[in-house]
From Swiss-Prot:
Family recorded in the similarity comment: Belongs to the CYSTM1 family.
Region (Disordered): 1-103
Keyword presence, Cell membrane: yes
Membrane topology: Single-pass membrane protein
Origin species: Arabidopsis thaliana (Mouse-ear cress)
Purpose of the protein: Involved in resistance to abiotic stress.
Compartment annotation: Cell membrane; Cytoplasm
Alphabetical UniProt keywords: Cell membrane, Cytoplasm, Membrane, Transmembrane, Transmembrane helix
Entry keyword annotation includes Ribonucleoprotein: no
Pfam families referenced in this protein's UniProt entry, alphabetically: CYSTM
Subunit organization: Heterodimers. Interacts with CYSTM7 and WIH1/CYSTM13.
Protein's name according to its UniProt entry: Protein CYSTEINE-RICH TRANSMEMBRANE MODULE 10
One cellular component term from this protein's GO annotations in UniProt: nucleus
Induction summary: Induced by heat and oxidation stress in shoots. Induced in roots in response to cold and salt.
Length: 124
């Protein structure tokens, strides 16, 4: 299959504007008709009586209500408040995150960035 239109040379621009009335639609298309086509149902879709009204429950549903009677109903039983659990005396207290010396993170980061820039400048 070729991507070029065989009716027009490559050096000439394609024709502009809408196609002429007699040339539209192209051959192979059915003649224009009203919408919707006659084989489709008209106003009143879906046809009256379709689907038929259901009587009671559809098939596959139990006749009794939900949930089935063998399950308990209502909230679970509530117990009196017992308070928090006792502390664990055998454990060590949590460690403080400031155990190591504060190293001045901002200044250390700036110095590292400056060293990297100097090293890259020297290499390139």
């Amino acid at each position: 299959m070729s991507y070029q239109d065989p009716q027009h040379p490559v050096s000439a621009p394609p024709p502009q504007g809408y196609p002429p009335k007699e040339g539209y639609p192209p051959a192979g298309y059915p003649p224009p008709a009203g919408y919707p086509p006659p084989q489709y149902p008209q106003a009143g879709y879906p046809p009256a009586g379709y689907p038929p009204p259901q009587q009671g429950y559809g098939q596959g549903y139990p006749a009794q209500g939900y949930p089935p009677p063998q399950y308990p109903q209502g909230h679970p039983p509530q117990y009196p408040y017992q308070g928090p659990p006792p502390p664990h005396y055998g454990q060590a207290p949590p460690k403080n995150k400031k155990d190591k010396k504060d190293s001045g993170g901002f200044m250390e980061g700036c110095l590292a960035m400056l060293c990297c820039c100097v090293l890259l400048e020297a290499c390139f």
